[in-house]
Amino acid sequence: GDNFVPYRGTSVYLAYNSETVENPPKTAEELYQWIEEHPGRFTYNDPSTGNSGFSFVANTIYNQLPEEAATSSDEKWKTEHTEEWDNAFTLLEELHPYLYQTAGKVQYPMKNAGSLELLANKEVDMTPAFVNMVLSQKAMGTLPEEIKLTQLEEPFLGGLAGFMIPSIGKIKKQHCL
């Protein structure tokens, strides 16, 4: 179908422990520097298991490209800007050894909740996270009060969820939203 009904939109912010991080990064460059200066204290979830991890990776890539690339479908961003792509993946590789580790190896938590669990247990001090997850978990008491949110000057990609009803559905009235 051609119809999309949004039911939830949320943003990814930087969630951090205010007891251990007095001055959270304000820019992506400051974040990358913080990660290197605080080995093992930052994580993002496996991007294939949660969008907050995907958001960190995608933003790291887009931050190396011209601003227009983030909203353009022009093939030139794939073919004419290979140096910027290479720089982005090099940056991710450079950050890799400074991320959260367990058993002596970098470990990417599973799902958005996995990153927040590490933050709640004080195994990391900072992670990208969906605002609605942080706020609801703080309200339920599963995230401590010292967990705060901040947004970088280069905002993280968010997440929009919605419903689509295919036009081949059995109940024709429902696909006419």
Predicted regions and their residues:
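A ligand-binding cleft/hinge motif common to bilobed small-molecule-binding domains
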Residues: 126-145
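A bilobed periplasmic-binding-protein/Venus flytrap-type ligand-binding module shared by bacterial periplasmic
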Residues: 13-20, 61-62, 159-173
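Short amphipathic alpha-helical coupling segments at ligand-binding clamshell hinges
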Residues: 27, 170-177
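Extracytoplasmic ligand-binding site segments that recognize negatively charged/polar headgroups
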Residues: 1-114
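Short helices/loops that flank or line small-molecule/ion binding pockets
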Residues: 111-127
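Extracellular/periplasmic catalytic domains that process cell-envelope and extracellular macromolecules
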Residues: 5-9, 35-37, 120-121, 141-143, ...
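N-terminal secretory/targeting leader peptides
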Residues: 99-102, 123, 134-137, 149-150
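Periplasmic-binding protein-like
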Residues: 10, 92-95, 143-167
